[in-house]
Amino acid sequence: MEAALLVEKNLNQALLDLHGLASARGDPHICDFLENHFLDEEV
């Protein structure tokens, strides 16, 4: 169980890093795709 949480945390961080890179490079299509399919807002 702990390993699964670590994998999920690492994957989420990689997606956030990718989103940051796409944002810095001015690629709204990748940003939108990541936001709509992977980066749900958490309450």
UniProtKB/Swiss-Prot annotation:
Domain of life according to the entry: Eukaryota
Cell compartment(s), UniProt: Cytoplasmic vesicle, Autophagosome; Cytoplasm; Autolysosome
Keywords assigned: Cytoplasm, Cytoplasmic vesicle, Iron, Iron storage, Lysosome, Metal-binding
Record's protein name: Ferritin light chain
Description of how the protein assembles with itself and partners: Oligomer of 24 subunits. There are two types of subunits: L (light) chain and H (heavy) chain. The major chain can be light or heavy, depending on the species and tissue type. The functional molecule forms a roughly spherical shell with a diameter of 12 nm and contains a central cavity into which the insoluble mineral iron core is deposited. Interacts with NCOA4.
GO annotation (BP), single: intracellular iron ion homeostasis
A molecular function (GO) term: ferric iron binding
Species the sequence originates in: Ovis aries (Sheep)
Gene from which this protein is expressed: FTL
Role summary: Stores iron in a soluble, non-toxic, readily available form. Important for iron homeostasis. Iron is taken up in the ferrous form and deposited as ferric hydroxides after oxidation. Also plays a role in delivery of iron to cells. Mediates iron uptake in capsule cells of the developing kidney. Delivery to lysosomes by the cargo receptor NCOA4 for autophagic degradation and release or iron.
Similarity comment text for this entry: Belongs to the ferritin family.
SUPFAM superfamilies: Ferritin-like
Cellular component annotations (GO), alphabetically ordered: autolysosome; autophagosome; cytoplasmic vesicle; ferritin complex
Start and end residues of each Ferritin-like diiron domain: 1-43
A Pfam family recorded for this sequence: Ferritin
